[in-house]
Amino acid sequence: MKTLVVTGFSAFPGAPANPTQSLMARLRRHARRIALLGWRLETRVLPVIYDETAPRLRQIERDLRPDILLHFGLAARRRMFSVETRAQARLNGLKVDALRRLPSPRGLESPDVLRARAGAAKLVAAIARTGAPAASSIDAGGYVCNQTFYASLRLSRAARVAFVHVPPIR
C-alpha cells in the first residue's frame, strides 16, 4: 500500500482558526475509503513555528515514508485555491510565527528556487472540477508555508510533493 501524507497548519498570528487544521480532521474520516484505492492516508497538523518546520518534516519522512506529500496552507489574501509550482529560498524577516518569533536571519539554504514535483495543472483541474476557483501560482510567499514547501522539496524522497494555498473560508 502506498502512503499519502497530507498536512495542514495550526493557528498563527492573524489566523486564530486555520481552516487547513479542520481540513485534516475531515480528511481522516475518509481514510477507509482511500484505503480501498490502495492508499494509506496520514494527516498531520504542523505548527506555524519557523524552528520546527524542518525537524517535523524529517520526522514525517522517517516515520511515514510518503509516496505523495501534499501540504495545505491558509493564504488570507487570496480568493482562490493556489497550487504552488515553486518554493523560494526566502523568508519574510518581519513576520512572526505562532511563538511570536522572527525567522533566523540566515534564511533558507540554496538553491534559490525549487520546483514542485507534482502535476500542478492536474491538481488545479481537480480542484476546479469541485466548483472551487483554482489556479497555479509561482509565489508560495515568505512565511512558514513557503518554508515548509521548500524544505519538503529539499528533504522528501516522495515522488510527488505539492502545496496548495487555501483562501479564507467564509
Locate the predicted segments by residue.
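Short, electropositive alpha-helical surface patch
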Residues: 138, 142-144, 148
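Active-site-adjacent mobile loop/cap segments within catalytic or ligand-binding domains
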Residues: 147-170
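N-terminal catalytic or cofactor-binding beta/alpha core of small enzyme domains
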Residues: 1-140, 154-158
